[in-house]
Amino acid sequence: GSPGACSPETSLNREWSIERARHTYSIPHWSEGYVDVGADGRLLVQPRGPGGPEVALAEVIAQARHRGLELPVLVRFVDILGDKLRRLQRAFGTAMADHDYDGAYTAIYPIKVNQHRNVASELVANGEHGFGLEAGSKPELMAVLALSRRGAIVVCNGYKDREFLRLALIGRRLGLDTHIVIEKPSELTVALEEAAALGVEPRFGVRLRLASLGAGKWQNTGGEKSK
């Protein structure tokens, strides 16, 4: 070869390593322990976090092709959702124990964040205790009522007409722990009327708005015109 040319053996290939691969692709900074580089250089996914079962992404792609699928394909590792939920609940549990807080913590997932059935179903399956769903519209509420287990907490937010309120109260008759968040007096009046008609005891929550206006990026979250 020409003077000064580097062969693969004396340049990049010789210097490449697992640690360099992790650093080059900043894997520790974005993976949260769910993705790593294996000893053979392949990308590994650990859906239940470090130390849990792992699968090489290349093997997933090979299986997809074997089944006749063509790339690109969308691969979802839904076990990550359950692990993230458990991490969240453990974090609050630890903080409450450290500060001698004797209350309870319930993780509420607003279904509007991701309405995909697999996402909501996986969270419900992993959140038997201390977990609930939030609905902000009639279509969302119907989906939440169908997904939730008996006794589960359901938070009802957003615009609430008579039909929405009646649907939320029907949830109580189905054995769900539905909470209607009251934002204006008229909602309370209608909810009480519908509760009496259905013969159920309603549960209400109240949305509080800060009267004072702060300063900074989020200053508009307070004051009389805040959401």
List the predicted regions and their residue ranges.
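Active-site-proximal beta-alpha core segment in soluble small-molecule metabolic enzymes
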Residues: 99-227
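N-terminal amphipathic/basic-hydrophobic helices that include classical n-h-c signal peptides
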Residues: 1-8
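A short linear-motif detector with a strong N-terminal bias
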Residues: 13-16, 22-24, 52-53, 86-87, ...
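Charged, compositionally biased N-terminal leader segments and the immediate start
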Residues: 8-43
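Low-complexity, highly charged intrinsically disordered N-terminal segments
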Residues: 32, 37-115
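A generic structural signal for ordered alpha-helices
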Residues: 12-13, 21, 55-66, 97-101, ...
